[in-house]
């Protein structure tokens, strides 16, 4: 016999699913609407760069640290980027202490790939001495509260943190500190599919009933820098192109709002 909590959870999922099939969302948003977005920068004093993003009730904190190290053999004049994402136990009853979950590793890869493939950071300017010394950029993403769409919030927080990062040249005797050389602002947009409906920024409840999710990271020129599908339900070719068009539209919108928010927070 099912527990009462399981029965309530099933009824809730059915309610949300039926609403969406009718073209409605539990919180009253349209299918193309994001939840309220709040950005704070320079929130970690000892980090070279940091940002906190609140998307609805989802909260993500990102800290950026730089240290010197040796370059990879096949890219001796380029700096190194290392991205880590932690699903803190305080963020959800589903997250437990211990080794990184597969889900966290997958999310970190999406954030990392978006930054790399878009050329967001001018990694050649992170070279100190070719073949000997480069800057290593550590991007640490901490999920503080999970109410859905962690990836989009993480992408936004990571880029905001990088855009406020100072390279600590002075402590290494390399001259004055300078801003991290940024060339691009990639934005990740996650689209959930429920029935035949596509919607942006799924909440935690919506993620529980969606059949598949597709995250599309794009650059400011509209090129796709990365794509990640989660879930077993397939997407038709028409749905894929519809999702890409929607992601590019929302990314352009969000990028403008975000740059405005960055200017205000500095």
UniProtKB/Swiss-Prot annotation:
GO terms for cellular component: cytoplasmic exosome (RNase complex). One of its GO terms (molecular function) is mRNA 3'-UTR AU-rich region binding. Pfam families: RNase_PH, RNase_PH_C. It is found in: Cytoplasm. GO terms for biological process: rRNA catabolic process. InterPro entries: ExoRNase_PH_dom1, ExoRNase_PH_dom2, ExoRNase_PH_dom2_sf, Exosome_comp_Rrp42_subfam, PNPase/RNase_PH_dom_sf, Ribosomal_Su5_D2-typ_SF, Rrp42_archaea. Keywords: Cytoplasm, Exosome. Its main location: cytoplasm. The keyword Membrane does not apply. CDD domains: RNase_PH_archRRP42. PANTHER family: EXOSOME COMPLEX COMPONENT RRP42, EXOSOME COMPLEX EXONUCLEASE RIBOSOMAL RNA PROCESSING PROTEIN. Non-catalytic component of the exosome, which is a complex involved in RNA degradation. Contributes to the structuring of the Rrp41 active site. Component of the archaeal exosome complex. Forms a hexameric ring-like arrangement composed of 3 Rrp41-Rrp42 heterodimers. The hexameric ring associates with a trimer of Rrp4 and/or Csl4 subunits. Belongs to the RNase PH family. Rrp42 subfamily. This is Exosome complex component Rrp42. It comes from Methanosarcina acetivorans (strain ATCC 35395 / DSM 2834 / JCM 12185 / C2A). The lineage of its organism: Archaea, Methanobacteriati, Methanobacteriota, Stenosarchaea group, Methanomicrobia.
